[in-house]
Amino acid sequence: MKPVKHLLTTSNKSANVPALTTKKGLHNLPLSPELKEKHNAKLIHDKIEPMVLRSPPTGESILRYALPIPSSKTKNLLPEDEMIGKIIKHLKMVVSTLEETYGHCDQNGEEPFVKHEHEELSLSVGDDMNSFLTYCSQFAAQLEEALKEEQNILESLFKWFQWQVNQMEEISKDQTLLQAEPPKPDKTVILNIAEIVRLVQRFEELKNRLKQRSKSSVKVMLSKTMDKENRPEAVKSCEALAQKIEEFLEAHSTDEFKDVSATEPQTAHSMTNRFNAMLKVFENQANMLERAVNDQVLLDAEYKQMQCDFQLLSEEKLVLENELQKLKDKEKTKPTNNRTKKAVKTVKKKDKGKSEDSEKKMSPEKEFKIKEDLDQVQKVARLEIENKVLQEQLKQALQEAEKAKHQLNYFLNQEKLLKSEGKTETTMQVGNSQTKVKGEDSKNIPLEKETRKSLVSDSGGQRTSDKIQEYPQITAQSGRLIEKSSEKKRSSPAISDLSQILKSQDESAFLESSNEVSVAENQSYKSPSETHDKSLTTVSSSKEVQDSLSVGTLAQKNETVISPFILPPVLTESKKADVSEEQLQKMTEEQTYQAAEKSQADSEVPDENLMVENKDSVTKVQIEQMKQRTSSMERHEETLTTPQLPEDMVLVSRIQSETKNLKATRNESFHSHNDVPEENLMLEQDTKSKTEVEVKKQKSFQDNQLSTHNEVPNERLVVEHQESLSKTKLQIKKQETSTEQPLTTPDKEPNENLILRHQDSMSKSEMQVKEQRTLKGQRIITHDEEPGKNLVLEHQDSVSKLEMQIEKTKKLPREKRHSTHDEESGENPMLKHQDSVSKIQVQLEIQETSEGEGRSIPDKNSMFVHQDSVSKLQMQEKKKITPGRERRNTRIVVPNENVISVHQDSKSKLQMQEKKQINSGVERHKTFPLEIKKKDISLEHLLPEEKVLLSRSESQTKKLQAKVTSRKIKNEAASELPDTAENLPAMYPSISDLIIQFDLNKVVETDIESLRGALGRRLLNDEFKTQSKSFPGPDIEQLTDAFGRDILKDEFKTRSKSLPETDERLHSTTERGTINDAIKTQLKRKSYPETVLKHLKGVNGKDIIKHLINIQSKSHGETDKEHLADDTGRGIIKGSINAQLKGHQKTDKNFFAYATGRGLMKESTTTQLKSHPETDKEFLADAIGRGIIIGPITTQLKSHRETDKELLKDAIGRDIIKGPISAQLKSHQETDVEPLTNAIGSSKTIGEIKTQLRTHYDVNLFKNKDMSVQRQEGIFTRSITPSKFPTKVINLSPFENKEETYEYSSPYVTAPSKAIYRTYRAGPSFSKDIHLPLLNQLPSGHSKVVTLSQKTIEFTLPTVTNTVGKPTYKVLHAAARKSVPHPYF
């Protein structure tokens, strides 16, 4: 260190006290004589209070005469002699001004004169002057004493300044010795010195040679000169070589080699080191070369592998191109549909995945070529798949053509039957329907082909043109044109399908109510022939609509579609139905009452369910005749005999063969289109019949007559294994409700939502027949048309259906108005995997439960998953008998509409349906859950008729369950939606196609984790929250770092749930040049209640560092938490924090929060906490400002034994050094809190303070607090202000005193302090030694004794007492003094 720094620090340390004393003495004399009198009263207690005199003028205030402390700049500029001269001159000026102000002190020179004047006045005034004179005399004596005291003080200060000058000289000498350590040599200097040494050596050699050269021989001289010239060349070459070596090492070696080459001289040893370094460099380069060679070999192998792969791909490409060419030739003549595009899209995805995998392996040079090849391969694969799809479509087209033939034959037979009945009106209507059907069939079939061709022509394979062609308008009897709305193009139909399906889940409650809306609005009915014609138009067009996955044209009002794959979609107008529910209910009740009177119990054709798939024309005619006749038992008997006809059996065999062929072609994805092969032959993903859409839109026109066409709920059905049965049923039901008179008792489309996933939908002709079943005047002419269409009962006993129908018609109470129209029992759809008995039961139950009111059958949403139909029958029969038998217009309308056999047994769902119908009171608008588990019902509850049916249906259910389980396994494997597959009914293997169509393979449910980071202009907020629920460890740690403009804020919050629960919080704020570090640690204990608190605050002027440490320990000695936050200013770096937590189980916690400022560094902090017996905590926080260094802080906590840990680390700044602070806390003994406030100015130094428990008074430990006079300098600051302090004893001794012993006793210190002995010599003999008191700031109320033992005392300055009762202490720590135990770094 420089001597100037130590001079400043020592002057700071010791000069403050005399400066303050002088200030107090000088300032109190003129301004407050009362205070002066009090100071004198301390020695002379009998003196009377002195007279008050006027204060000196403000312009001559004593502050003007304060001695300025020379700053560092002035000390650097002025020599010591000039500085001493200035101080002496200033002191003389102060003395002269004081004499002028208060008078001269020569033996009361002025005061007797003052007394004389007062005496003269006393003669005139009288006795009062006597007292005044006495006061004047006393004041004169006091003034003389004060002047003497001031003179002594000034003289002592003058001598002290002289001594201080000598002291500075000694310190400067000592510092020069201590600073003799050479600084780190500069490399350039060392190299220059070495070069100079070499040149000097060469010069000496040349000089010697010249001296030894012979003068006589010139030749010898010439030869020597030649040698001299050659040698420098050799030296130059060596130097050049050495320079090259150094350059090589600098370029390739590490710092170690650079240092060696730079610092060491060019000796043999250094050269060997350099060569070794070069060898290491070469070795490293050789290793790198070897690694590069190995990498090259690996890359070559990979390249060869990629070439092989490329060749294989090229060969495959050629093969695929050939196949592509073949497919292109075939593609021109074959139609296509949306399924081809979707299949192509899935292949494209697979090919893309393959291409990505292959591209990763390929080198970047060939990626472009490979991409092109892969695109071609993908095209080939697409075309190949399209070829297969087209082949399947050809087969489907043939089957559809065959269906069309059957339909034509059926309609012709139906027309003949109607004419034979003699009913001209119905005959005319049927004729119109036939013509319309034929015309539309002829129109729709070419349209279908055109759409397929147009879709095939779409080379991109993208489903961009998923639209349904607009179809010709159909004129209704009302005269309005019903336009078939063209569906919009959709880039991703899967998204729209999914969105509608999701909406359908929310609006499932509106399904049944929506059906009633159409019934309420049907004020006038349409003739059955009209509705029949409209429904017939849906036959041919439905195929095309089903092929296209158009989702946009959902049922417009009353239709709810349950997709077989997901959930029932939302009907667009279902909300409107809810508004008019109550009105509809009232209207339907009135209508049912009227209808009951006019309707007859036409138990119509129970045998229709026994009809075969290929709709025998004979059976159709019989059904029509039976429905057109009055309800008579003779017709029932005739119809009962119909299923036994040989023609029906032939048709059954034909249908079975057709279904087998269809299954083979569709990979079991198409479940035999046995149901209505003439109409429905629905594709796996056939969505809906276009004619159904037309029927719905026709129904929307509600002029006078809202003919309630149960508007094809399958309109939106993307039905893989489903056919349009429910659509026709819905239409029939709504048309039945429309009667001439208000007899609209519609069992309103209970099964509107029913989607027969694995069931062939009822024939659309059945829908038409049902629609035509509207009551005309006296009776309901229900054209049970084409019962055979629906009668494909693969796994059903047709006999059981008839029995169930007959039994339930008998069971139904035929009391008042109980006209149960067992209408179209034959219309029950052929449920491939469902018992037909359950269908009939569902129909009977639903129709019976509607008590005179249009009770919508709640089976709309019911989907029966592997449920026994027997239990359903039981529930149905029970609930049919139980409801009140009044005014029952229960029309068994389309009983099979309610059955959605998606591998479900209809038993439990019927039970649920019947229960909800009975409990719902009048409305019963309750939608059932999609999947209801089996509810086994014992045979005890079965009626005798049901037991018979049970025995018959057991075989069917067993077969059904076997197939269901096998297909269920396939479908589960095919399903790529793990989240929804569990809640959905099982599906056939064609589910993969559905997934491909909807792009559902892309749908993956992911967990979203939200992460937030806020980045301002220069602000970064990071929040970490860690929670550990283990027994001993911490629970929550939260870190929030905020970076301001030049500010770093750290906040740590840790919470522990272990036994020693701790809580710790820190908050710190940083300003322009200020560092506030607040550390608060709270340790909660269970055994020992008292706490230990240590509080430290450091305050600095311009560069202030504040440390706030609050440590509270409440447990047995186990501290579980440490919290630290350091705020760093402009140029400060915060170090890491290490915390080790040890509880019942050892847990180590290491946390590093490291921030970097401009170029300064902060030390790390380490805390070690141990469990029950001892707790060791070491805390070190170093903050470095511009010129300030704060030393480490060490805290050691010991529970049972008294130990002390001392940490001596000093950091040195420009002018200021703050020493370490060490505190020792004892657990079982009474602890004490000592707040230390350290004020650091521009030239102040804070030393090291050791504090212990107040219980130990016998030991004195006050290290580095030797406030010796030798280390004090600089009394005065620039502006001297009055301050208050207690002084015990001031001993002024001559400088000849060789040794001084300083002892500081305090109740806080328990260890003996090391006595500091030093001998000081002073030049002049008249100099005196003044010992000024230490100003230690401690809590008020604690006294401090300072004993300065001196051999001789010339005189004692009078002590000045403070006006404040309690003494206040101010600790001015000076740490940079040259103390013996202080090491220098």
From Swiss-Prot:
InterPro entries listed in its UniProt record: CCDC7
Annotated Basic residues bias: 339-352
Tissue spec. comment: Expressed in epithelium of normal cervix and cervical cancer. Overexpressed in early and interim cervical cancer.
Species, as recorded: Homo sapiens (Human)
Chain's role: May play a role in tumorigenesis.
Region (Disordered): 329-364, 422-545, 572-752, 809-834
Annotated coiled-coil segments of the chain: 299-330, 374-411
Feature: compositional bias, Basic and acidic residues: 353-364, 437-455, 481-490, 573-589, 665-676, 685-697, 712-726
Bias (Polar residues) ranges: 425-436, 493-503, 511-528, 536-545, 654-664, 701-711
Protein name as catalogued: Coiled-coil domain-containing protein 7
Entry keyword set: Coiled coil
